[in-house]
């Protein structure tokens, strides 16, 4: 009999975000991948919301589109074949919730991966566009070189955020020796960020 992981990273992220998703109007899936996060967002939001999902691989968006259609939710998600770095070309409103699932598309080319330079460029901009009480969730995978670089930068950068404007939390299974994912949750606590 297989043991159920009650505190797996995916379950923790969904638990932490569920309340925020229900109240969100503009949501962004920065790293769409196979579409699981976009599906979760679409399943847990009302019809009158705006979900934007980004990926640089057509294969990822095709998988996402198939998954969303299978659940009759494709109409709720705007899929963009573009980097999340260019989010401002598509989303001008304040954003209520942003989710990152860094790394590479499972089952695809592991050399096509998110890059620290993109994160460095986009995250400060995204935080400026985050609505009051908006939330950013970043799942960081440190089992590959690009993931280690992203995580090193995240650890350094997130500690510099003004604690009067942002709450930053971190979750990890620290008794696992297999490069378990690390989850960062950022909540804007004031109306205007002071980055």
Model-identified regions with their sequence ranges:
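S-adenosyl-L-methionine
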Residues: 1-25, 36-39, 43, 62-92
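Class I SAM-dependent methyltransferase "Motif I" SAM/SAH-binding loop
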Residues: 31-35
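Conserved SAM-binding motif I beta-strand of class I
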Residues: 50-55
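Mobile active-site "lid"/loop adjacent to the S-adenosyl-L-methionine
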Residues: 99-121
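Conserved beta-strand signature within the Rossmann-like core of class I S-adenosyl-L-methionine
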Residues: 129, 133-140
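Class I S-adenosyl-L-methionine
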Residues: 147-195
């Amino acid at each position: 009999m297989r043991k159920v992981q009650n505190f797996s990273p995916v379950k923790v992220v969904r638990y932490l975000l569920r309340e925020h998703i229900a109240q969100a109007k503009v949501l962004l899936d920065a790293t769409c991948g196979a579409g699981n996060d976009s599906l979760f967002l679409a399943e847990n939001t009302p019809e009158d919301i705006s979900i934007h999902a980004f990926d640089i691989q057509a294969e990822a968006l095709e998988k996402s589109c198939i998954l969303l259609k299978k659940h009759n939710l494709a109409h709720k998600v705007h899929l963009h074949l573009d980097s999340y770095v260019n989010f401002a070309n598509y989303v001008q409103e304040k954003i209520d919730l942003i989710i990152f699932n860094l790394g590479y598309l499972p089952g695809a080319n592991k050399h096509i991966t998110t890059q620290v330079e993109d994160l460095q460029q986009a995250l400060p901009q995204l935080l400026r566009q985050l609505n009051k009480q908006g939330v950013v969730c970043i799942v960081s995978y440190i089992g590959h070189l690009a993931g280690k670089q992203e995580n090193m930068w995240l650890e350094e950068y997130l500690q510099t955020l003004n604690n009067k404007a942002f709450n930053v939390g971190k979750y990890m299974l620290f008794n696992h020796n297999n490069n378990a994912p690390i989850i960062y949750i950022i909540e804007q606590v004031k109306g205007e960020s002071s980055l």
